[in-house]
């Protein structure tokens, strides 16, 4: 208790007076300690309001009456603000920042920004001691934080944008140089890898892409594609060629006794001649379409190409036999025919083809006179009906020779033979679409199909091979690749690199 009494004796009491009505308003100026502000060094100080934002709060001055005025503009403007909830802030000079200049123009500058919300939940007072020892407390109205202003000149918006662009250029330049260095390093590494590969043994396993194989096969097909296909097809069709040779021997034996033969000697061998697909009948030469047999199966693209190649291989021995027979018994009609064919061959390639077909037809008529007998009996098909009585034209070989020679002289044969060729080419797909049509899912690798796919959109070789699958075409993968390579060479499509892959396309 004594301690408490002694402590209470040491307490000093002060009188604090709070004035009710004060004309003065007190504000606090807060400086950052890092700015190292020393009031003792201040010889001169000037404080003023920054009223530069007054233009922002100002409204456009419009005349209320007279020229350029609007009727009830203020009312309509207020209605618009209420509609959109726009609240205008009044320009209050008390809320504007302070500008403090110390020691004239050469001194420092500070800008004091009002700190809001300081006096909302707290009350600050400034105590001043009077002469009688009492304190007067004055409430703080506002709080301002003063920060020093930069002395150097700042950039405008346009200048800052220009500097930013220059900075981007500099950074881009550095990045470009860095990319070049990286590229050079990559090239050096690639060269080193190539040298290492060249030093390695050549007997290494190499995996090729399907597109590379197709391009390689298309390049090699010029020299060895046809020979390889002929060799493989000759192996497959070995029994067929043997049968063809037997038929040729039979024909040769028949031709030897042709001069002494009578009208009915060839009736037993008619079926052999009618079943022969390589020789062209007079019905085809005269333009009548050939009715397919029911026994014939559906022919694919490879079978058609094989039959055409076999017919090309069979042509030279037939021509040799024709030359031997012409040497034995040359007639004036044949001499005239030879002259016409030689003139046509000198004129153009088409006339060569026409003369060859006409000579082949001519010799076919010479060899098989009973075929003329089948025309009046209505046996245009390869059917089994026997011929009726022989016509007057088939009485002797001289009549057929004269008729053929007269047709050659008139020039009808030259116009009919290309039509017969077209009929033979056209009847092939017709026979496929007729009795011996393949199933609806079968697909043939044709030039029209490839052209149709390439005109739609650019495709790679993989896409084309997917379109022509082995299950649908009936061909092996090697045959499909070879056929596609030949078709692409003929079409010669445009080549584009899309995503590191070669794409082929055609324009309509």
From Swiss-Prot:
Subcellular location: Nucleus
Keyword Transmembrane helix part of the UniProt annotation: no
Biased composition (Polar residues): 378-388, 428-443
Composition-biased stretches (Acidic residues): 255-270, 303-325, 343-355
Processing after translation: Phosphorylated on Ser and other residues by TAF1 and casein kinase II-like kinases.
PTM sites of type Phosphothreonine: 156, 331, 389, 437
Biased composition (Low complexity): 389-406
Any Pfam family: TFIIF_alpha
Region annotation (Disordered) ranges: 177-448
Family, per entry: Belongs to the TFIIF alpha subunit family.
Protein name: General transcription factor IIF subunit 1
Native species: Rattus norvegicus
């Amino acid at each position: 208790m004594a301690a408490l009494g002694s402590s209470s004796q040491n307490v000093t009491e002060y009188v604090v007076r709070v004035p009710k009505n004060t004309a003065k308003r007190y504000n606090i100026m807060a400086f950052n300690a890092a700015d190292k502000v020393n009031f003792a060094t201040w010889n001169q100080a000037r404080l003023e309001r920054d009223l530069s934002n007054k233009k922002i709060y100002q409204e456009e001055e419009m005349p209320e009456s007279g020229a350029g005025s609007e009727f009830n503009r203020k009312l309509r403007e207020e209605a618009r603000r209420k509609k959109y909830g726009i609240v205008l802030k009044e320009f209050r000079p008390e809320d504007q920042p302070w500008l403090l200049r110390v020691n004239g123009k050469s001194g420092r500058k500070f800008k004091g920004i009002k700190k809001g919300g300081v006096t909302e939940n707290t009350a600050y007072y400034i105590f001043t001691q009077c002469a009688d020892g009492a304190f007067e407390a004055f409430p703080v109205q506002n709080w301002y934080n003063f920060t020093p202003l930069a002395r150097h000149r700042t950039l405008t918006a346009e200048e800052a944008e220009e500097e930013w662009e220059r900075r981007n250029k500099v950074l881009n330049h550095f990045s470009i140089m860095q990319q070049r260095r990286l590229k050079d390093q990559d090239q050096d590494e690639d060269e080193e890898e190539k040298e290492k590969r060249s030093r390695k043994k050549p007997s290494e396993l190499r995996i090729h892409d399907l597109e590379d194989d197709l391009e390689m096969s298309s390049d090699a097909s010029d020299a060895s594609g046809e020979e390889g296909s002929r060799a493989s097809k000759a192996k497959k069709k070995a029994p067929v060629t043997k049968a063809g040779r037997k038929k040729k021997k039979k024909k040769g034996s028949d031709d030897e006794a042709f001069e002494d033969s009578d009208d009915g000697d060839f009736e037993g061998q008619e079926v052999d001649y009618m079943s022969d697909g390589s020789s062209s009948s007079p019905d085809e030469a005269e333009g009548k379409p050939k009715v397919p047999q029911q026994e014939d199966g559906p022919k694919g693209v490879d079978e058609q190409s094989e039959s055409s190649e076999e017919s090309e291989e069979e042509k030279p021995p037939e021509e040799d036999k024709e030359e031997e027979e012409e040497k034995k018994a040359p007639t004036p009609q044949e001499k005239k025919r030879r002259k016409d064919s030689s003139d046509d061959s000198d004129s153009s390639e088409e006339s060569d083809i026409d003369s060859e077909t006409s000579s082949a037809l001519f010799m076919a008529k010479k060899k098989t006179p009973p075929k003329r007998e089948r025309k009046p009996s209505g046996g245009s098909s390869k059917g089994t009906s026997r011929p009726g009585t022989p016509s007057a034209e088939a009485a002797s070989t001289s009549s057929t020779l004269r008729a053929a020679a007269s047709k050659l002289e008139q020039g009808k044969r030259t116009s009919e033979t290309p039509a017969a060729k077209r009929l033979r080419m056209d009847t092939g797909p017709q026979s496929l679409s007729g009795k011996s049509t393949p199933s609806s899912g079968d697909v043939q690798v044709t030039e029209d199909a490839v052209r149709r796919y390439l005109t739609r959109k650019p495709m790679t070789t993989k896409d084309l091979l997917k379109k022509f699958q082995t299950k649908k075409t009936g061909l092996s993968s090697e045959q499909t690749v070879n056929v596609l390579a030949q078709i692409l060479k003929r079409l010669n499509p445009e080549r584009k690199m899309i995503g590191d892959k070669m794409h082929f396309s055609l324009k309509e």
